[in-house]
A protein has these predicted regions:
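Extreme N-terminal tail/first-helix region
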Residues: 1-15, 67
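A generic local structural motif
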Residues: 1-3, 28-29, 48, 101-102
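Generic signal for short, ordered secondary-structure residues
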Residues: 2-3, 34, 72
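Covalent nucleotidyltransferase core used to form phosphodiester bonds in nucleic acids
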Residues: 4-6, 40-53
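A generic structural micro-feature
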Residues: 8, 23-25, 55, 108
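Short beta-strand segments
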Residues: 11-45, 61
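Short, structured beta-strand-loop surface elements
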Residues: 46-121
Length: 124
């Protein structure tokens, strides 16, 4: 997914479209996606997030790259509960902003986090 790596190098801001957990309607939001050693993650500060509820019930989503590439990529999200992976993501340079928002122990325990994967036949 070179196009995704290239896009996130300068700016982690993307849009995602999820399917509403209750409504079934498409929901598009702006969010950050982190490139952590070639794997892609979306996280946030501690708290309830509609995007996480949507992805928990409907893990398929569309990642919209909008800075340079302007590409819509089908993807799948998986909730990250493994503490080793969570720590690796939160310790990564790309997650430094989050570490300034809450203590790392709180981020580890309560931050929403999903790993984003792309099908092998996705463009890029």
């Amino acid at each position: 997914m070179d196009v995704v790596h290239d896009e996130l190098r300068d700016d982690p801001t993307i849009d995602i479209t999820t399917t509403g957990r209750r409504s079934g309607q498409a929901r598009r939001i702006e969010i950050w996606m982190l490139d952590v050693d070639g794997r892609f993650f979306i996280t946030g500060t501690p708290g309830r997030r509609d995007w996480l509820a949507n992805l928990t019930d409907h893990p398929e989503l569309v990642v919209h790259l909008k800075r340079h590439a302007h590409v819509d990529l089908p993807a799948r999200a998986e909730v990250v509960s493994d503490p080793v992976t969570r720590r690796r993501v939160l310790d990564h340079l790309s997650a430094r902003w989050y570490r300034g928002q809450a203590p790392v122990d709180e981020l580890m325990a309560r931050s929403p986090m999903v790993e984003i994967t792309f099908p092998a036949d996705a463009p890029g």
